[in-house]
C-alpha cells in the first residue's frame, strides 16, 4: 500500500485568510493528500473545508513550526506551503527561518506565497 503525500500548510496571522481561500479553491485537490497544519491555521482551514482531514500540531509560536520541521527532517512531510507575511515583525522569526532552511536542506517543494502554491498544487495534481 502506498502512502499518501503529506503537505504542510502554515500561514502567518496576516495571511491566514489567504490560506483559507487557497484551501477552499483547491479543496478537491488537497483532499487527495494528508494535510498537517499549525494549530490556528489548521483550525481555520478545517472549518472552511470540512472534507479535508487535517492533523493539527501546536500553534506556530508555541512550537508548531518546529514540529513540522521535525516531520520534514524525518521525511514524513514532503511538501511545504507556508504563506509568509514579509511585512510584519515576528517574534518567532528564528523558527520560521529554521523551517524554511529545513525545506531547502531536504529539498522538498516549498511555496512561500499564493502564486507559487497555486502552481505547485497544479503540478502535484
Swiss-Prot record:
Pfam families from the entry? MGS
**Can you name a GO cellular component term?**
cytosol
The UniProt entry annotates the active site at 65 (proton donor/acceptor)
> GO molecular function: any one?
methylglyoxal synthase activity
* BP-aspect Gene Ontology terms: methylglyoxal biosynthetic process
Q: Could you tell me what reaction this enzyme catalyses?
A: dihydroxyacetone phosphate = methylglyoxal + phosphate
Annotated CDD domains = MGS
Q: Into which family does the record put it?
A: Belongs to the methylglyoxal synthase family.
Q: What is this protein's name?
A: Methylglyoxal synthase
Give the organism the record lists.
Brucella suis (strain ATCC 23445 / NCTC 10510)
Organism lineage: Bacteria, Pseudomonadati, Pseudomonadota, Alphaproteobacteria, Hyphomicrobiales
